[in-house]
């Protein structure tokens, strides 16, 4: 992930202002250590910190159209850029960067081109012909982005809060699936799929449709000009990503450049569930597996850095971000610049253990909708910023637009958890990849129970965090918590501890308002807490809080596999510019 910063219409074109923009842009250099760029046109500034993943030699930013009247700075990957270039035959491209198409698409179609992009992105585009600008963020919010306003009438854009919090009177999270246009004078929603209105869909479950859609999502993300790998915890989601990647890597441009054997990475405390399962899956798939161990003290020592980089005080996010943060540093030290990760499946398929309590399919579906819409505040934030802290890019195939639309059009009855019928959480996904003739995964991995990342790395990790917080936050501090922190008042010592650190780095009221709050149990939304009366007094975000559902063992012995597996899909047509895509 790159880092972008823009200051637009600040009524100051002085050298001092340029120096200030450069200074603020350097706060984002961890995201893009490969190159820095700054474009100035009057009182408009576009800065870029580049992580070179596509076309490292010539793709430096900002990028331009032919006559350089349109300028764009982008953080993202446009997976269909080759297809889009074919639609822009009258345009001359200067680089091989996937992001250059944005300037030309705007020139050809105006502001409404954003839905044509298939990828993850945040960008700022300046049209010097009339001094107008637009800003856009991807559909789900995989890339992080903030918008702020100065007292001088300026508009500020930054990949991270730390790029603008000291210079803006007010700032907020830029909403996913929207663009902001100076011509329109505000935001416009460009991503509005049918499932957004939360009405219950009725498409029958077709396992092969799910399989094809997800394989396509993984394959298109193999577009890279640098070494890459997969994050492999040994759970269902990361294991499927690894399995599909391993199957389709051969013959791609990436394999020709970096070799056909996939590298996988796992992190955990000694003896943790993830380390054991990750190693087993890696051996099954034949990956070059890298296992990273950390201690509870290692994690505690990193908490301040994690909060500074991830920019949140949300308990669940910090718990899970810390091991990912530590692992990302190790991965980058090996020369890897991009990883595939498994975020998003639990939101789409109702994979969290509390979904066992969903009273009906309408409630189940509406909760998945709420969870997906909030992903940019939680797992997307974690995956993006804990990796970007070390100049590592995370790609998340479960959050592919086409795949989400396929999965969210299903009748939610098929997603509901019914253990008596052998249907555990994410059953429809497991069933889609249960192939007897060409198995994707061993059965007990395919049907391994859900572990939240912060649990799977080792149960003593969360217990250690709670103990450490208790040593730093006393009862008197908790009794005054509502006065000290009237917004999102911390209700545990662990939450109070994180909040104190956050406020040191980001003391502005705008900053604290960017962090979500409300009742939760086992990662639920506040609405889902109503599903079980016993949850109202148990506000632990850990998956273990789903009392009566969580199994500490993960060997699959408690799962009834009563559903016959699918037959292999033979002789499916495949095509892709740099690899293969399975056509539906």
Curated annotation (Swiss-Prot):
The record marks 343 as: Important for beta-aspartyl-AMP intermediate formation. InterPro entries: Asn_synth_AEB, Asn_synthase, Asn_Synthetase, AsnB_N, GATase_2_dom, Ntn_hydrolases_N, Rossmann-like_a/b/a_fold. L-glutamine binds at residues 50-54, 75-77, 98. GO terms for biological process: amino acid catabolic process; asparagine biosynthetic process; cellular response to sucrose starvation; L-asparagine biosynthetic process; response to absence of light; response to fructose; response to glucose; response to sucrose. Its EC number is 6.3.5.4. Keywords: Amino-acid biosynthesis, Asparagine biosynthesis, ATP-binding, Glutamine amidotransferase, Ligase, Nucleotide-binding. CDD domains: Asn_synthase_B_C, AsnB. Residues 193-516 form the Asparagine synthetase domain. PROSITE patterns: GATASE_TYPE_2 (PS51278). It comes from the Eukaryota. Residues 2-185 form the Glutamine amidotransferase type-2 domain. Induction: By dark. Down-regulated by light and sucrose. The keyword S-adenosyl-L-methionine does not apply. One of its GO terms (cellular component) is cytosol. ATP binds at residues 231, 267, 341-342. The active site is at 2 (for gatase activity). Essential for nitrogen assimilation, distribution and remobilization within the plant via the phloem. NCBIfam families: asn_synth_AEB (TIGR01536), PRK09431.1 (NF006949). Plants over-expressing ASN1 have increased content of free amino acids (mainly Asn) in flowers, siliques and seeds. This is Asparagine synthetase [glutamine-hydrolyzing] 1. It comes from Arabidopsis thaliana.
């Amino acid at each position: 992930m790159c880092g972008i910063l823009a200051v637009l219409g600040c009524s100051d074109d002085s050298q001092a202002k340029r120096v200030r923009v450069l200074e603020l842009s350097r706060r984002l250099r961890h995201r893009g250590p490969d190159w820095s760029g700054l474009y100035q046109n009057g009182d408009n500034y576009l800065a870029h910190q580049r992580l070179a993943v596509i076309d490292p030699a010539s793709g430096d930013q900002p990028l331009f159209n032919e006559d350089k009247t349109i300028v764009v700075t982008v953080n993202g990957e446009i997976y269909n850029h080759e297809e889009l270039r074919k639609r822009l035959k009258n345009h001359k491209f200067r680089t091989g960067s996937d992001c250059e198409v944005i300037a030309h698409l705007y020139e050809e179609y105006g502001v409404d081109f954003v839905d044509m992009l298939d990828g993850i992105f945040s960008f700022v585009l300046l049209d010097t012909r009339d001094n107008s600008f637009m800003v856009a963020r991807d559909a789900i919010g995989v890339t992080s982005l903030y918008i702020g306003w100065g007292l001088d009438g300026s508009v500020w854009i930054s990949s991270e809060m730390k790029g603008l919090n000291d210079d803006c009177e007010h700032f907020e999270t830029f909403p996913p699936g929207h663009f902001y246009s100076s011509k329109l004078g505000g935001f416009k929603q460009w991503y509005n799929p049918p499932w957004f209105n939360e009405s219950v869909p009725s498409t029958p479950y077709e396992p092969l449709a799910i399989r094809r859609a997800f394989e396509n999502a993984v394959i298109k993300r193999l577009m890279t000009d640098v070494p890459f790998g997969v994050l492999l915890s040994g759970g269902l989601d990361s294991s499927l990503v690894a399995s599909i990647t391993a199957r389709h890597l051969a013959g791609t441009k990436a394999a020709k450049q970096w070799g056909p054997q996939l590298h996988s990475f796992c992190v955990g405390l000694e003896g943790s569930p993830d380390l054991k399962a990750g190693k087993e899956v890696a051996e099954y798939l034949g990956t070059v597996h890298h296992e990273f161990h950390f201690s509870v003290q290692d994690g505690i020592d990193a908490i301040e850095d994690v909060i500074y980089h991830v920019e949140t005080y949300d308990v669940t996010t910090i718990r899970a971000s810390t091991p990912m943060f530590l692992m990302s540093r190790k991965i980058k030290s090996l020369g890897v610049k991009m990883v595939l990760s498994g975020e998003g499946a639990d939101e789409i398929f109702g994979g969290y253990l509390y979904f066992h309590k969903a009273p009906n399919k309408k409630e189940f579906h509406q909760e998945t909708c709420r969870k997906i819409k909030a992903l940019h505040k939680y797992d997307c934030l974690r995956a993006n910023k804990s990796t970007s802290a070390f100049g590592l890019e995370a790609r998340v195939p479960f959050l592919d637009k086409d795949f989400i639309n396929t999965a969210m059009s299903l009748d939610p009855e098929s997603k509901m958890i019914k253990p008596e019928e052998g249907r555990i959480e994410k059953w429809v996904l497991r069933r889609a990849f249960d192939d007897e003739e060409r198995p994707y995964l061993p059965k007990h991995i395919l049907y391994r129970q859900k572990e939240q990342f912060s649990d799977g790395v080792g149960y003593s990790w969360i217990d250690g965090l709670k103990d450490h917080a208790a040593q730093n936050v006393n009862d008197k501090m908790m009794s005054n918590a509502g006065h000290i922190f009237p917004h999102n008042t911390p209700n545990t010592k662990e939450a109070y501890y994180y909040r104190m650190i956050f406020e040191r780095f980001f003391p502005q009221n705008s900053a604290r308002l960017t962090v979500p709050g409300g009742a939760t149990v086992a990662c639920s939304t506040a609405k889902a807490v109503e599903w079980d009366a016993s949850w109202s007094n148990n506000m632990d975000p850990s998956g273990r809080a789903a009392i009566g559902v969580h199994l500490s063992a993960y060997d699959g012995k408690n799962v009834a596999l009563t559903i016959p597996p699918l037959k292999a899909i033979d002789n499916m047509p495949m095509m892709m510019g740099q690899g293969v895509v399975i056509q539906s």
